[in-house]
Design a protein with these regions (language model features):
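Cytosolic juxtamembrane helix and N-cap/initiation of the first transmembrane helix
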Residues: 1-21, 110, 117-120, 124
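Short, amphipathic, aromatic/basic-enriched membrane-interface segments that mark the entry/exit
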Residues: 6-12, 28-39
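Membrane-embedded alpha-helical segments in integral membrane proteins
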Residues: 17-31
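Membrane-embedded alpha-helical transmembrane segments of multi-pass integral membrane proteins
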Residues: 22-25, 43-47, 67-74, 106, ...
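Alpha-helical membrane-associated segments of multi-pass integral membrane proteins
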Residues: 26, 87-128
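Short, aromatic-rich membrane-interface segments at the entry and exit
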Residues: 33-42, 59-64
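Interfacial non-cytosolic loop connecting adjacent transmembrane helices
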Residues: 34-39, 72-101
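Loop-to-transmembrane helix junctions at the membrane interface
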Residues: 48-79
Length: 128
């Protein structure tokens, strides 16, 4: 059972799919709230995540590491949104913060676990 959980957490494809959910959410935010110019940030990140899904290995880990670093810079704001219930001027999100923030933190964990597994060569894709 523990190995099944570790295999799930260290699978780069699972991490890429979780990141894709975040990208799709941000595409919605671009059209609904921020404006289409926000896609200038979102689409390249989506491209990195898609490339990591298909490439795998150490190159895939490096591709996935770039959005993960961006997520880590946002962690203080994420924690602030969880503790205060306000999401930095995005008050229209409201209670959705309590759904989005844990998912985002889980995605960061998935990213880190899969990056380590791919970099070490211990993932299930290491021999393929």
């Amino acid at each position: 059972m523990n190995m099944a959980i570790m295999n799930f957490l260290s699978d780069i494809r699972n991490a890429a799919l979780a990141n894709a959910v975040i990208v799709v959410f941000h595409v919605y935010i671009a059209f609904a709230v921020e404006g289409v110019s926000f896609l200038v940030i979102v689409l390249p990140i989506g491209g990195l995540i898609a490339a990591a899904y298909f490439v795998k290995g150490k190159i895939g880990a490096a591709l996935l590491a770039l959005p993960t670093l961006g997520y880590l810079f946002a962690v203080p704001d994420i924690v602030g949104a969880l503790t205060t219930g306000e999401s930095g001027g995005d008050d229209h999100i409201g209670w959705g913060v309590y759904i989005l923030v844990p998912f985002w933190l889980f995605t960061i964990l998935l990213n880190i676990m899969s990056i380590v597994a791919e970099a070490r060569g211990t993932s299930k894709y290491a021999n393929s």
